[in-house]
Amino acid sequence: MILVIEIGGTKLQLGVFDPSRSVLVHCERLKVCRTAGAQGILNQIESALPSVLKGLDVERCGIGFGGPIHEDGSVLKSHQVTGWDCFPLAAWVREKTGLPTHVANDCDAAALAEARYGAGVNLTSMFYVTVGTGIGGGLIRHGQRQGTDRPAIAEIGHLRPGLLSNLATDTVESYASGQGIAQQVHLLALEVGRWLQTGQVTWEQLPAFGQLQIPIPTMDQIQVSDDWYRSLESDKLTTEHVAAAAHEGIWLAKTPLQLATTTLGWAIAQMATLVAPQRIVIGGGVSKMGDTLFWQPLRNSFAKYVFGPLRDPSLLVPSLLGDDVVLYGAAAIAMPPQA
């Protein structure tokens, strides 16, 4: 049996994986309190370990972590939660459990999971993208993770979307992740307020939206958008709120989603043009928005920007392992490499 742990930006999962049956036999899901930082998450793990391990013959541990990882299993940093810089995560878990412990970036782990157990089975190459709180990627060739000797690889979320993106914070993740979509809604809401005050509607303050050639909204659309935004607790805005409003046709919700899927499709097209994977598997909470809001516009954007001979939108498929993908990946990295 294998102790498996996922440490993300908003969730924490611990479970036990049975490699003889390739199934999770136990799983506990916890919410991450970001304000408590890394120490808060470590406290949660330590508190949960006794109940997770009780009565089970566990021999090793695998961890998928939301950030770049050193070869020795220590954390380089987290882009979501403070306090992780240079933390010896593998050594800490070994000390608490006595188990041989392996740590990988969560997207690399998820990519390996889909290749072994999910949508990438029997393929020689596969690229995995997670679109959740952040955006990450993992590349698998011949059943093996690529870049294991490097602190990061296939970090599609940290691509700069175009030559005019001069700020380090101006990334694919800043437009297309769950956090990024919410932030773009907030920025666009500020513009909506200005438009209502001045009666002048321009994209001067938000050039990324202007580059999409989105038609100027009517004053009725602007007013409905402003009313919707004011009805929310803005500090608790989620992609679920945005998706629900977009389905209702609210312009302020639909427009950032258009920016998100266009930007992400562009980024996936760049990766596909460079490495030509047989399949591109996409997971994470944002990918659950459905065909109309996510998959159809994403595939359209991918087809627009990818190199012609690789223009096959059917290459983009959803994850088969869903919310458990990183736990399956944590198990895979803890097992001996496959021949």
Predicted segments with their positions:
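Short beta-strand segments
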Residues: 6, 62-66, 128-134, 138
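A conserved active-site-flanking secondary-structure segment within enzyme catalytic domains
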Residues: 146-162
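Conserved A3 ("GATE") glycine/threonine-rich loop of ANL adenylate-forming enzymes
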Residues: 10-11, 107-109, 133-136
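Adenylate-forming
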Residues: 110-116, 137-139, 158-160
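ATP-binding/phosphotransfer module of carbohydrate and carboxylate kinases, centering on a glycine-rich
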Residues: 1-60, 70-72, 91-99, 113-125, ...
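A charged helix-plus-loop insertion that forms the helical arch/lid used to bind
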Residues: 74-85
